[in-house]
Amino acid sequence: MSRVNPLSSLSLLAALVLAGCSSQAPQPLKKGEKAIDVASVVRQKMPASVKDRDAWAKDLATTFESQGLAPTLENVCSVLAVAQQESNYQVDPAVPGLSKIAWQEIDRRAERMHIPAFLVHTALKIKSPNGKSYSERLDSVRTEKQLSAIFDDLISMVPMGQTLFGSLNPVRTGGPMQVSIAFAEQHTKGYPWKMDGTVRQEVFSRRGGLWFGTYHLLNYPASYSAPIYRFADFNAGWYASRNAAFQNAVSKASGVKLALDGDLIRYDSKEPGKTELATRKLAGKLGMSDSEIRRQLEKGDSFSFEETALYKKVYQLAEAKTGKSLPREMLPGIQLESPKITRNLTTAWFAKRVDERRARCMKQ
């Protein structure tokens, strides 16, 4: 997904108007749960070695209050588990080999646009707003926050930067929970603090990274039986675990083997993807047209998909064919791809690791 770098003036105005004035009534507690004091639990659960532990506690307490989240041990430990997994509680974690990754991205863009590398490297020797050349800053960059700032300057100040990147900053995630910047830009409503800059810059702060990361993890309705499926969704996108289970049902009913990745349609095209084509094979039994199937699959990024006729009928067909009840939640089978990842990792691996951390947190 492309990430728009500057926050539009309209979004900024909305964020400023909403800042500091939006608390919601907390979500109802589940049976057997009890409310906790979020700040006290964070101070208790975070290692004493964490810098600004008190500030983390206050920011997370404000996050829970402003988003109306149920203040439970499971929810707090879930957020802490993601932050520990993603950054080891560092607001702006260092990324090994980030300078090399950045230069490779620049060279890749130049090659794609048929611009000689030496021209690009020469252009980057000019002085940037902080007094150092862009080359010097790229050579010494250690964190995504630093790299994002370099690209912001490069895009806004240097014609070559605009040629290579347009208005799109290639740094796509940030902060202590490594939340998507595009996601944050789309979910500013209710943000409780005044923003001094863009949403992108806010994501790289402790409070912003926690607020948007927690929103992505907990602030959507789901029918999951365990937190591990939210952890998978955090990595793969909202409802990926539910949608992977639905793909499994489509596969059982149609006989078509599908990748259980949680993507029900092609979001980059109106052309049908493999899941949509497999579902179309069931059109006669479903009593639905191709266009009806498409319209209902498009609800796959919302909770309401579970209430569609398509969702219910596919499970009826699949369970009748297999003679057994099928799961409504599955860990998606997605290979994690990023220049920062040097091992063979999957969404399921991520979800299980985070869930182990959550369980340890709750037992402490």
Enumerate the language-model features and the residues they cover.
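Bacterial N-terminal signal peptides that target proteins for export
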Residues: M1-S11
